[in-house]
Amino acid sequence: MDLRALLRKLGHGQSLNADEAYILGKGILTGTLSEVEIAASLTAMKVRGETAEEVAGFVKMAREFAVRVPLTVEAIDTAGTGGDGAGTINLSTAAAIVAAAAGAKVLKHGNRSASGMFGSADFMEAVGYNLEIGPERAARLVEEVGFAFVFAPKYHPAFARVAPVRRQLPFRTVFNIVGPLANPGLVKRQLIGVAETRLLDVISEAAARLGFEHAVVVHGSGVDEVTTEGETVVYEVRKGAAERYTISPGDLGAPRVPLPRASSKEEAVAKALAGLRGELLEASIAIAVNAAFALYVAGVVKDVKDGYELAINTIREGAAYRKLMEAVESSKT
């Protein structure tokens, strides 16, 4: 299909189907489109609102361009769209560590923070993890240690083509939605946090279209995490269908506590580590409620209440922090 025809379609406020979005995305990443055309297409989708079909098409394209991690075991991911501006510590990464310590296999895919203070890669780098590990090594770490972190720019090098345009646009684009769904290990089980409520529908439908076995999409009262301060809206995707419900900390057996926030990278690292060691109550609880959903998605527990109990005990027993240190040391060898 003619790329210019797709651009005209977007210019008239029309949405693309998944195949058309795939073609457009390929045109962007291969350099076929100019920077002006890329900016126009990303802006048109943003103004209208990206659809689930468009996201699914872009994810399919991103997966084809990715450096593949050859997983030999079934793994999960925990990822968020970011952009909530809440200043919380990196809960999804800490929750992934806890889930791994409690028996899940985790291939955590992430990046540095693009708009906020602290991304998952910033945290992993700060604790000494080697961000340069290759795909075969990552697969072995998932199998042997139960956890590996893969740095998005290393596994999605084609995204560098669109980076200059994205940096100049004063808003987040479809690529911010695609990233969390484009795990290079092609995981089929995932916890996904969204910063905007409209993305609950978009991402859950996209996950269903992409054939996820079990995905849970969450928005926690303004943050792209499961919140400990109030209600979290949950869209649970299984067998191509999504179920919507809300959940509060008490439903998991957890108390309501303030989300752990930080005003610097150093403070964010310190609070996350204290939470993983069980030394900062609010951080430990916030990490555990997110890990509860990760363990549920992984099939380690039958429900999130059991997941929270397992997660908080894993933290209290010191296993979560030990798993982080094991992952860090294993990434260097």
Curated annotation (Swiss-Prot):
Disulfide bonds: none annotated. Pfam families: Glycos_trans_3N, Glycos_transf_3. One of its GO terms (cellular component) is cytosol. Coiled coil: none annotated. Mg(2+) 2 binds at residues 224-225. Keywords: Amino-acid biosynthesis, Aromatic amino acid biosynthesis, Glycosyltransferase, Magnesium, Metal-binding, Transferase, Tryptophan biosynthesis. Anthranilate 2 binds at residue 166. 5-phospho-alpha-D-ribose 1-diphosphate binds at residues 80, 83-84, 88, 90-93, 108-116, 120. GO terms for biological process: L-tryptophan biosynthetic process. Pathway: Amino-acid biosynthesis; L-tryptophan biosynthesis; L-tryptophan from chorismate: step 2/5. Its EC number is 2.4.2.18. Its cofactor is Mg(2+). Mg(2+) 1 binds at residues 92, 225. InterPro entries: Anthranilate_Pribosyl_Tfrase (IPR005940), Glycosyl_Trfase_fam3 (IPR000312), Glycosyl_Trfase_fam3_N_dom (IPR017459), Glycosyl_Trfase_fam3_N_dom_sf (IPR036320), Nuc_phospho_transferase (IPR035902). It is an enzyme of class 2 (transferase). Anthranilate 1 binds at residues 80, 111. Binds 2 magnesium ions per monomer. It catalyses: N-(5-phospho-beta-D-ribosyl)anthranilate + diphosphate = 5-phospho-alpha-D-ribose 1-diphosphate + anthranilate. Catalyzes the transfer of the phosphoribosyl group of 5-phosphorylribose-1-pyrophosphate (PRPP) to anthranilate to yield N-(5'-phosphoribosyl)-anthranilate (PRA). Belongs to the anthranilate phosphoribosyltransferase family. This is Anthranilate phosphoribosyltransferase. It comes from Pyrobaculum aerophilum (strain ATCC 51768 / DSM 7523 / JCM 9630 / CIP 104966 / NBRC 100827 / IM2). The lineage of its organism: Archaea, Thermoproteota, Thermoprotei, Thermoproteales, Thermoproteaceae.
